[in-house]
């Protein structure tokens, strides 16, 4: 067992692409945790998608023995955290398991929005923060400016920042010395009752659920009967150990240490992230604060292209859910698409990742409907319904009011693009709250915007308006009443539920027109006329028609009586009428994606 004063638990905070995983790689190499043979980039990002997108999705830990310059042996526990805003709850739990954090900032870029969000999370947990300027070997590096930014924006003393290059390994030794010297040792009593924080968990097909935890007080041994605080369920610890970075078994772990355990748990809900582990024989009364159940905020329908693929898709979704409690799904049926699932996600990146994993790991062929947020409908009898699908919207007569989620956007942008960003936020029904200059050339703009407005193309538009220089962070703040209506799309007078959307009344007409036009372009011509209508209730607000193919039925008539030709044309007309009544309109996948791009024209 390690002595408390020789342990350092730390996280690395960084914006995407500022070099967090690369710094972790160098630390593992310098301390000899990864041999030359095993060496590879992004060592801790095990998932193929993490490697490819260059992002960290799941938290990982590594126990690193390190002999410092003072001759003492220290145990450094690196707790690797996701950096993206969708996974902010995981980040807050990982930070709660640490005493300190390395703030890695790209010296060519400066402080970005998501870095800032995670730094403030770290400060909320009273973490000691060490600023590290990365990529100093690049010619465009400007350490003085970035150090000044860190001091002004975050309020950290940055008079002597660590200047490193994680890629080449320059000065990474100094980072390890700084962890030992500047970060505090954990507090805790190994003899007190057990109290440990779960900061991540995943499902292993051999061992069941693997739980990553940090012990605050007490000691845990293999064979102990543990209790999960929020559920009250008890389990026997079958495996206990630490990651170095490969799993290594241990007989016992004590206060201040970070490790993993398996206890024959069958599903992730048995060990929710942020929960407290105690001993069943001696449970603690006060659990670790800040535990919350993660709620999905974005919903969309996922349908198999072939009806026969329904069961394999269900099995794939169940497997993904084993590793991701924030992801939820339930069966639903659509008149247009048949049987499928309504899936809930933390945010847009989370949705993209799940869809990509389904296609990649399970070879699923999917039709995805447009994502929607959760609305709150207040009925005349006072009841409040949560609506995650436009087709569940109650009738107008029963409805008293509709509320939608609002989020606070914090956009970091160079001075030259402020006008373009303000215009974009105003278009999205945003309310400006604040605008302050970090430096003479960089601005932070704060807006409150309906979450539904940033769902589809806000990120893309923001990047294109600012030539890729803007960075963004958002958090959902509250629900507000809005003048919202349900827009239906009718194809040959039949409503198609997959195209329904809830939109603001002011933008309903342009949105409906744009969507009808996009569908007209996406739906191929057929032997009969296709009429596309956009409607609010019974009022048609836009109409487009796809003209039918025309077969020349009179081609075989050479001269002769006009009545013969007329008879053939009448017969064709009758046939087309019957076809229109009976015929099914084939709607391609591109048409479902048209909903996402509606309103752009």
From Swiss-Prot:
Q: Which Enzyme Commission numbers does its entry carry?
A: 3.6.5.n1
Q: A biological process (GO) annotation for this entry?
A: positive regulation of translation
Question: Which GO MF terms are attached to this record?
Answer: GTP binding; GTPase activity; ribosome binding; translation elongation factor activity
User: Looking at the UniProt record for this protein, which Gene Ontology cellular component terms does it annotate, in alphabetical order?
Assistant: plasma membrane
- Top enzyme class: hydrolase
Residue ranges crossing the lipid bilayer per the database entry: none
Q: Which UniProt keywords apply?
A: Cell inner membrane, Cell membrane, GTP-binding, Hydrolase, Membrane, Nucleotide-binding, Protein biosynthesis
Would the keyword Metal-binding turn up in this protein's UniProt record? no
Give the bilayer topology: Peripheral membrane protein
Sorted alphabetically, which Gene3D superfamilies does this protein's record hold?
A: 3.30.70.240, Elongation factor 4, C-terminal domain, Elongation Factor G (Translational Gtpase), domain 3, P-loop containing nucleotide triphosphate hydrolases, Translation factors
Cited function: Required for accurate and efficient protein synthesis under certain stress conditions. May act as a fidelity factor of the translation reaction, by catalyzing a one-codon backward translocation of tRNAs on improperly translocated ribosomes. Back-translocation proceeds from a post-translocation (POST) complex to a pre-translocation (PRE) complex, thus giving elongation factor G a second chance to translocate the tRNAs correctly. Binds to ribosomes in a GTP-dependent manner.
Q: What is this protein called?
A: Elongation factor 4
* Native source organism of the sequence: Maridesulfovibrio salexigens (strain ATCC 14822 / DSM 2638 / NCIMB 8403 / VKM B-1763) (Desulfovibrio salexigens)
Gene giving rise to this polypeptide = lepA
